[in-house]
């Protein structure tokens, strides 16, 4: 798994609208990996990122959610939950692999990376705790460090 100080990977994936997204990772960017759309903890986490999205945007911090779900599933999930940030579809696990995340179980672990200036600047493992409050923690720490 990538750690603090590692170079940001070059990745591209389709979002829930079928558009190809290639994050630059120059300005502060949050990439959070989650196991699966429409599951309890993942839905909580996505909604918390959505609720905090205006504050992320005010601080010029990008947010991307990534799972092994396909574009259509992401589109359904985003519509049902009212998510307006990009959910990147990674059905072949290429984005996860670029971050050093294991997908052998058919899903990714719940992991979050903050990238800026072309490198990883923070990592979070909310798998160790309830995902509630995770988005707020990431926002506050990233805003404090980079804004």
Role assignments for model-derived ranges:
Residues 1-147:
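Chalcogenol-based redox active-site neighborhoods
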């Amino acid at each position: 798994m990538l750690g603090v100080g590692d170079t940001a990977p070059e990745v591209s994936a389709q979002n829930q609208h079928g558009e190809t997204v290639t994050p630059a990772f120059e300005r502060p960017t949050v990439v959070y990996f989650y196991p699966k759309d429409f599951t309890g903890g993942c839905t909580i986490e996505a909604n918390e990122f959505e609720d905090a999205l205006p504050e992320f945007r005010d601080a010029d911090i990008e947010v991307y959610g990534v799972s092994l779900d396909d574009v259509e599933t992401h589109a359904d999930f985003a519509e049902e939950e009212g998510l307006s940030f990009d959910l990147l579809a990674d059905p072949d696990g290429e984005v996860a692999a670029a971050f050093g995340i294991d997908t052998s179980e058919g899903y990714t672990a719940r992991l979050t990376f903050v990238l800026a200036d072309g490198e990883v600047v923070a990592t979070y493992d909310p798998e160790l705790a309830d995902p509630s409050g995770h988005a707020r923690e990431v926002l506050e720490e990233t805003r404090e460090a980079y804004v």
